[in-house]
Amino acid sequence: MKLHSQFLKLHSRHGGAAEASVTLDELAHTLGCTHRNALNVINKLAGQGWICWTPSRGRGRRSSLKFLAGAEEVALSSMMQAISSSDIRTAVEGIRGHARSSSLQDTLQGWLLAYFGYHSEQRSDKRIDTLRLPVRQQLHNLDPLYMNLLAESFVSSHIFDGLVARSGGQERINPGLAHTWDTNEPRTVWTFHLRKDVLFHHGKVLAAEDVVFSFERMMITSQRMLYSNIFKDIWEVKALNPGTVRFLLKQPNELFLPFLCTSRAAIVPRDLETALAGSFGRRPVGTGPFKLVEMNEDLCTLEVFPYYFQGRAHLDRVEILHVPWNIATAAPETSSAFHIVHNPSAGSSAEWSRIHSDYSVRKFVTCNTKKKGPLSDPLIRADVLACLSAGSDSLGKSPVDSDTVRAGNDAAATALQIATIPQYAGDAEAVAAKLNGCGYCCRVLSVSPEEFKGPVRLQADLIVFSLLRDQDEQLRLFDLYSTMVQHLEPRTRADIEGRLRLIAREPDNEARAAGFREIEDSLREKHQLHILYEKPAETAYLPSVRGVTFNSQGWVDLRHLWFPPEL
């Protein structure tokens, strides 16, 4: 593929004319090599029939270079070689570097996407079913304790299990690694009885001490984590015997059991993290339906775990690949092998069947009223949020009387800092553009999820983030508001913290939901929260896919997915 790249470099520099007149010095400079190596490359390209080279003798004399092959032809050949050898990084970089036109880029992306989807092959009279699934988020860490991204949670949910579980669209909590559980009347003591002979991927049998280890490492971590306000209510985890675990809570918390259904509360083996010397996040071992066999910055490969306690998955192998562009912009037709796409664009092929997973993503802006600055003034906040509402379909508009709009206020001369993470940088830039158009001066600061958990939010004026409205919505709202109070002025903070304490003790699901709505309404009335927009999370799939179900986050559940054989 190096020869392909060298051809494309020459074509990019000298391919504009039917025949180019070049010196050896110019060729060496273009290729970034010596005269001797440049001649070797020219001879190889001529041998491939890609160029015609007519040399002229003498130093500095110009020779004739004629291109016999087109750049698209050679680029496509290079990409196909990369795809055939599963070198996705090279393929992606090639598309970025050599696609000089949108039509070529679409062609190359289409070829790459053909690599994805369902593939079946025979090995020793056995059919091996493989699903290649692209994700836009790069996987960094699959440790339930440290993962930050939804894509990481998606993969982790197929490697690990929790004590209890929920299926997509169901409020009822079902047995997981625990076959049953009970609690005392004050609901501060929870006892879980484990299934027998559940195996981890490395052959160890699950025991109560593994559960104790999994939760104790949560309780002692100093890292800011999703749902930390829930598991910080755990006073003690104790193994009563190899098959029984008891949790003692500091106070009743009706979100405790739903928390145990999340991928954050997955059970890990107590002996493995030490043995792997800190690399557990990239070499995880759980009890789930798939085990990880390979993970690098571009590819995560899962293989079926045949001894899974809830039955073997239908797929034999799942390859999850990082593809940085929006998959839907190059979606293949129904004749392609590409079967599953997350979050397809509205322009995807009409031949695709779509189903909503009943979950949505809400993007919002919050104001830092704890910081001394222009947004500590409610009238300025009202004006800022009114600017964001103007001419949009955003939810939760903050209506402001025209007499209170202060378009010429001193805040316009003060730079407002907008903090977010890279995944939401586009939304933050759109917010900045709207406010700039209203006379404000804004600067976007995009930091990693880890940095975002630190003081960055407290130093910003506006924070752009999102809420996944899935089956864990109440947990996410509790975590969101518990975090948000850190950048709110004391009176509002005390009010919200009091409401959250009541919600945590409320056994009725609908009453808890009403409590969260009251918090949202209060923040909107005080111009401290503005919802930018909300859109459903969808999954597109072709008719040949069977067993499409969703996990609690709205992702396709791979353990039930299967493809009928060609008969």
PLM-predicted stretches and their roles:
Residues 56, 113-117, 383-407, 426-431, ...:
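Detector for C-terminal structural segments
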Residues 146-150, 154-158, 164-169, 261-313, ...:
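Gly/Pro-rich hinge or "lid" segments in bacterial periplasmic/extracellular proteins
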Residues 134-183, 216:
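N-terminal lobe/hinge region of extracytoplasmic solute-binding protein
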Residues 307-349:
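Ligand-site clamp/hinge motif
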Residues 303-306, 354-380, 501-502:
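A bilobed periplasmic-binding-protein/Venus flytrap-type ligand-binding module shared by bacterial periplasmic
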Residues 17-20, 41, 148, 180-224:
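Aromatic- and charge-enriched surface segment that lines or borders ligand/interaction sites
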Residues 64, 228-271, 294:
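Surface-exposed binding/hinge segments that line
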Residues 138-152, 204, 256-263, 540-556:
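A structural "hinge/loop" feature
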